[in-house]
């Protein structure tokens, strides 16, 4: 197998592993608040929004140490151990207790930081300037198939259900736990690519497992060096500009993965289908993600226009979705009580309109995330782990803030925040992309 084919295979395995893990985790996140509201146990007093806020708060702080962990453990072991904690969090829903719910929310925040930083490192090591766009799209498309499978089951199993029974909850989360474990094991199939340059020789050190006779002092030195690189990289001009758009991706991640599905489920106008529509909404978000990731993956190798047109498509698609959501969804939908909301907005809601907005949210998200993965890999090929750690740090901080305010803000205020960050984040991305293009032209002269 040629070196390029081996790298492509690694990307496919990486994407499939994440697909299994996040089939379980994203489905859990989409239905967490609904499941918790339906719990019969009087001893459980958790909040899905609060749990997600804890996850992303810890996630953001843990990104500062994630490169150090990866420098010591290597990418494969880091992703595997993180996957085990993801599985433990999902398994907790089989028989939830308030203490285990919030404890595992903290642990999975740490695991997420290590997992996503290792993913960015693995993606960069298996790519170059010519293939980074294609590989980012392929990985993103495979990852977002996770939005389809779990949510399809939720839709079929919970169709017509108003409250989720203990039996249904246990059945779903046992299956999701097994699926998550399968994804974790797949990471061991990734092989370190053959190095064809000094740059890859250096980068491959962060992918190989930390085996052999590395001393404790050597581990500490390696960890501290990775930490210092993260701090230095976080204050570069390019990273500061990109941070605005990165913050937006965190805000809209919260919206489509946690808030929007809950809003649909709280609308009494949808009747007995409201709960099953949560799963169907997740499916349509996934369809948009897969379409975008697949399309940009195919175009990535032959994209002569750069990343800006894709980001423009993302902002147009998202703003259209926000406008339609504002028109049809009642303002109290995100904070409605267990009995739901009977309020109306400006136009009559319909299932078709709700699912169309779900699709647009997914398509727009794929536009932003594929291009962020691509531009970070191009800007920081020698410092991929610190770069992706900073990316995930900013994204998770904004996601945590969004999960906190989702408990209190009416829908129209949440949409306004998204529009403001989306607009200015897109402008900042343009400046970084133009600077990178000029640098590439200068180096080619």
From Swiss-Prot:
Transmembrane found in the keyword field: yes
Disulphide-bridged cysteine pairs: none
Glycosylation sites (chain numbering): 40, 163
Cellular localization per UniProt: Membrane
GO cellular component: membrane
InterPro entries in UniProt: Ion_channel_UNC-93 (IPR010291), MFS_trans_sf (IPR036259), UNC-93-like_regulator (IPR051617)
Keywords noted in UniProt: Glycoprotein, Membrane, Transmembrane, Transmembrane helix
Protein name: UNC93-like protein MFSD11
């Amino acid at each position: 197998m040629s070196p390029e084919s081996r790298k492509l295979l690694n990307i496919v395995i990486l994407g499939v592993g994440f697909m299994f893990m996040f089939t379980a985790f994203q489905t859990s996140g989409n239905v967490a608040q609904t499941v918790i509201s339906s719990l019969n146990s009087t001893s459980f007093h958790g909040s899905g929004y609060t749990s997600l806020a804890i996850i992303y708060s810890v996630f953001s702080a843990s990104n500062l140490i994630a490169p150090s962990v990866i420098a010591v453990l290597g990418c494969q072991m880091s992703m595997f151990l993180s996957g085990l904690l993801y599985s433990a969090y999902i398994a907790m829903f089989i028989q939830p207790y308030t203490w285990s719910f919030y404890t595992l929310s903290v642990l999975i925040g740490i695991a997420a930081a290590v997992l996503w930083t290792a993913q960015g490192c693995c993606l960069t090591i298996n790519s170059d300037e010519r293939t980074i766009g294609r590989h980012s799209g392929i990985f993103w498309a495979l990852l977002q198939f996770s939005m389809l499978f779990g949510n399809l089951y939720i839709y079929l199993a919970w169709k017509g259900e108003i409250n989720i029974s203990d039996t249904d909850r246990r059945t779903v989360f046992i299956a999701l736990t097994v699926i998550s474990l399968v994804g974790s094991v797949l990471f061991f199939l990734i092989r370190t690519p053959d190095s064809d340059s000094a740059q890859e020789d250096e980068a491959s050190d962060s992918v190989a497992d930390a085996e052999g006779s590395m001393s404790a002092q050597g581990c500490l030195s390696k960890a501290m060096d990775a930490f210092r690189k993260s701090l230095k990289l976080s204050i570069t001009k390019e990273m500061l500009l990109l941070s605005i758009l990165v913050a937006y991706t965190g805000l809209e991640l919260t919206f489509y993965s946690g808030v929007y599905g809950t809003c649909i489920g709280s609308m009494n106008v949808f009747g007995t289908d409201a709960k099953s529509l949560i799963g169907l909404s997740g499916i349509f978000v996934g369809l948009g993600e897969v379409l975008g990731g697949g399309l940009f993956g195919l175009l990535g190798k032959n994209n002569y226009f750069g990343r800006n047109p894709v980001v423009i498509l993302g902002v147009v698609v998202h703003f259209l979705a926000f406008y339609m959501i504002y028109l049809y969804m009642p303002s109290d939908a995100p904070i409605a009580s267990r009995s739901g909301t009977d309020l109306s907005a400006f136009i009559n809601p319909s299932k078709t309109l709700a699912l169309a907005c779900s699709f647009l949210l997914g398509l727009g998200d794929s536009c932003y995330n594929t291009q962020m993965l691509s531009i970070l890999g191009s800007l920081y090929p020698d410092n991929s782990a610190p770069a992706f750690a900073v990316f995930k740090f900013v994204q998770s901080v904004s996601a945590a803030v969004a999960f906190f305010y989702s408990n209190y803000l009416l829908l129209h205020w949440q949409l306004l925040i998204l529009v403001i960050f989306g607009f200015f984040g897109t402008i900042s991305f343009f400046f970084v992309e133009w600077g990178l293009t000029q640098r590439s032209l200068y180096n080619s002269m």
